[in-house]
A protein has these predicted regions:
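Reductase modules of NAD(P)H-dependent flavoproteins
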Residues: 4-8, 19-23, 161, 168-278
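Ferredoxin-reductase
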Residues: 5, 12-105
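Generic structural signal for buried aliphatic residues
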Residues: 58, 109-112
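Histidine-anchored nucleotide/phosphate-binding helix
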Residues: 141-153
Length: 278
């Protein structure tokens, strides 16, 4: 997988034909939104028995020639929402994504019945600020997390940092900036605590540069108006390309942060271990 292909949202697994079809629900596509020529999202029905933690992922796919063609996708919808939502890149020759990008309303898709993952708030130690570092479609799990009222009770500030190449790749920007703060149930706390910091690398924008650069030179925290990131007060969640995961993890480690070693073991930051290339 190259750095342009975001983990958690189109990741190949081996021995796909061994999957038991009984482990999947068949869901119906309700809507499809194409953000640009490389990025799209879609919503589906949700089986009433499906339960997950915000930040979890599922296997989704299509039945091709009688066999399931599957990839791991983070769930972009919150665990209390009626439908499921997913964010995906378009890969012209990708075994699954080349087919998924042509989904239309009414089509069916396979969704695994057992969501899993290590990118969950429960595995973070208490802190003051929660940083959500995502690149590309690594935004997906954080969309579910910023819609979780419990997250805002745990932290004074929730800082969503989304790094992309082009402005058109800033999926959900309007929702984050204008719709979520007006949520009828918890919009007031979103307005008070959520900080959205999109940054672009390949064209002019109000914030420019890679996330790692903005952390290392201090610009990100200075722009937000908080002290530089430190393990005494700050917690982090990371989702993106393997290169980005490695870089930010190394930077946090060098500053004294300790990663959660596994499910049920709190740390200063968490990553989705299933998507970290060995």
């Amino acid at each position: 997988m190259t750095s342009r292909r975001q983990p958690g949202h189109a990741r190949p697994l081996s021995a796909l034909t061994e999957y038991d079809m009984a482990a999947f629900n068949t869901e119906r596509v309700l809507s499809v939104h194409h953000w640009n020529d490389t990025l799209f999202s879609f919503t589906t029905t949700r089986d009433a028995a499906l339960r997950f933690h915000n930040g979890h992922f599922v296997m989704i796919g299509l039945e091709v020639e009688g066999k399931p063609l599957l990839r791991a996708y983070s769930i972009a919808s919150a665990n209390y929402e009626e439908n499921l939502e997913f964010l995906s890149i378009k890969v012209q020759n990708g075994p699954l994504t080349s087919r998924l990008q042509h989904l239309k309303e009414g089509d069916t898709i396979l969704v695994s019945r057992k969501p899993v993952g290590t990118l969950v708030v429960d595995d973070l130690k208490p802190g003051k600020h929660l940083f959500l570092f995502g690149t590309g479609t690594g935004l997906a799990p954080f969309m579910s997390i910023i819609k979780d009222p419990d997250v805002y009770e745990r932290f004074d500030k929730v800082i969503l940092v989304h790094g992309v190449r082009w402005v058109s790749e800033l999926a959900y920007a309007n929702y984050i900036e204008n719709e979520l703060p007006n949520n009828e149930f918890f919009g007031d706390v979103v307005r008070d605590k959520l900080v959205y910091y999109p940054t672009v690398t390949r064209e002019p924008f109000r914030n420019q540069g890679r996330i790692t650069e903005l952390l290392e030179n201090g610009k990100l925290c200075a722009d937000i108006g908080i002290p530089q990131i430190n393990p005494e007060t700050d917690r982090a969640m990371i989702c993106g390309s393997p290169h980005m995961l490695a870089d930010i993890s190394a930077m946090l480690d060098s500053r004294g942060f300790v990663v959660s070693p596994g499910v049920g073991q709190p740390g200063d930051y968490v990553v989705e271990r299933a998507f970290v290339d060995k």
